[in-house]
């Protein structure tokens, strides 16, 4: 049973997922800080208060906090979208380079095979 768990835990997909979760949590903190400390104060200045999230409420319903959470989500989702798009672009370039190397090797082997056939 320990061997099976070790095989499961050390599979590439599980390790990739664990790394992605940790990096996602760290990335979330960065983006949340960006939204909370830079973007929301700028938006607050536009609407006439420093932090509208705490001040915008009606009968105890703090819809300003909800609006801030929605903006936070949109910015985090967009940042992750850009990050994934860049990562996919880099991965495609690496795959294309690997395919080119394989094709070059195949061409050389084909030429060697043809030369050996001619000598016979």
Curated annotation (Swiss-Prot):
Topology Extracellular: residue spans: 44-62
Subunit structure: Homopentamer.
Naturally occurring in which organism (per UniProt): Staphylococcus aureus (strain NCTC 8325 / PS 47)
Chain segments annotated as transmembrane: 15-43, 63-82
Protein name (database record): Large-conductance mechanosensitive channel
Domain notes: The extracellular loop between the two transmembrane domains modulates channel kinetics, and in particular the length of time the channel remains in the open conformation.
Any one GO biological process: monoatomic ion transport
Membrane topology (Cytoplasmic): 1-14, 83-120
Top-rank taxon: Bacteria
Main location: membrane
UniProt family annotation: Belongs to the MscL family.
Membrane topology: Multi-pass membrane protein
GO molecular function: mechanosensitive monoatomic ion channel activity
Pfam hit, one: MscL
Task performed by this protein: Channel that opens in response to stretch forces in the membrane lipid bilayer. Forms a nonselective ion channel with a conductance of about 2.5-4 nanosiemens. May participate in the regulation of osmotic pressure changes within the cell.
Effect of residue 47 to E/K: Decreases the duration of the open state of the channel. Increases mechanosensitivity
Gene: mscL
Gene Ontology cellular component annotations, sorted alphabetically: membrane; plasma membrane
Subcellular location: Cell membrane
Keywords: Cell membrane, Ion channel, Ion transport, Membrane, Transmembrane, Transmembrane helix, Transport
């Amino acid at each position: 049973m320990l061997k099976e768990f070790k095989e499961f835990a050390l599979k590439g997909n599980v390790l990739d997922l664990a790394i992605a979760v940790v990096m996602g949590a760290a990335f979330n903190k960065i983006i949340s800080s960006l939204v909370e400390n830079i973007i929301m104060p700028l938006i607050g200045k536009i609407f006439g208060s420093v932090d509208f999230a705490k001040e915008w409420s009606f009968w105890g319903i703090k819809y300003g906090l909800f609006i801030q959470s929605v903006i936070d989500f949109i910015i985090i989702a967009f940042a992750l979208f850009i990050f994934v798009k860049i990562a996919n672009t880099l991965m495609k370039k690496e795959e294309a380079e690997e395919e080119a190397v394989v094709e070059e090797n195949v061409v050389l082997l084909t030429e060697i095979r043809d030369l050996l056939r001619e000598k016979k």
